[in-house]
């Protein structure tokens, strides 16, 4: 469960993500494809090469959706219900992949936020991304 302190840390550090959504998102996706190559199966129509426009665009969408979740932490489920439906019913993404991408996004944050990615910030993002993954997986039940 996200505490008030967690929410404050997320909102403060998210300010540093703004303006870098496409870069951070693309980097997280590329890390996921390298580390967990089985995830590529969900993107058969994408050019999966480094710097691909499709990866950059999708990365931006992912990080922008996370930004909306940061803004709407109190009612994340209702704010992101459409995404949950899309991933469960249309794309049929195995929910374990949400955790894989979350791990890669946390690495990207650590690399770019450097000293500002403290253990408390790491804990807050871990809890937040887990909550987002749980919300996306709601429709699978």
UniProtKB/Swiss-Prot annotation:
GO biological process, one term: hydrogen peroxide catabolic process
InterPro entries the record matches: Globin, Globin-like_sf, Globin/Proto, Hemoglobin_a-typ, Hemoglobin_oxygen_transport
Binding-site list for heme b: 58, 87
Keyword Iron carried by entry: yes
UniProt KW Oxidoreductase keyword: no
A Pfam family of this chain: Globin
GO molecular function, one term: metal ion binding
Cellular component GO terms, alphabetical: blood microparticle; haptoglobin-hemoglobin complex; hemoglobin complex
Positions of the Globin domain: 1-141
PROSITE patterns (UniProt xref): GLOBIN (PS01033)
Keyword entries, A-Z: Heme, Iron, Metal-binding, Oxygen transport, Transport
Tissue specificity remark: Red blood cells.
Quaternary data: There are three forms of hemoglobin in Sphenodon: A, A' and D. Hb A is a tetramer of two alpha-A and two beta-1, Hb A' is a tetramer of two alpha-a and two beta-2, Hb D is a tetramer of two alpha-D and two beta-2.
Note: Sphenodon Hbs have properties not found in other reptiles: poor cooperativity, high affinity for oxygen, small Bohr and haldane effects, appreciable phosphate effects (those properties are also found in the Hbs of primitive urodele and caecilian amphibians).
PANTHER family per record: HEMOGLOBIN FAMILY MEMBER, HEMOGLOBIN SUBUNIT ZETA
Function: Involved in oxygen transport from the lung to the various peripheral tissues.
Family: Belongs to the globin family.
Name of this protein: Hemoglobin subunit alpha-D
Gene source species: Sphenodon punctatus
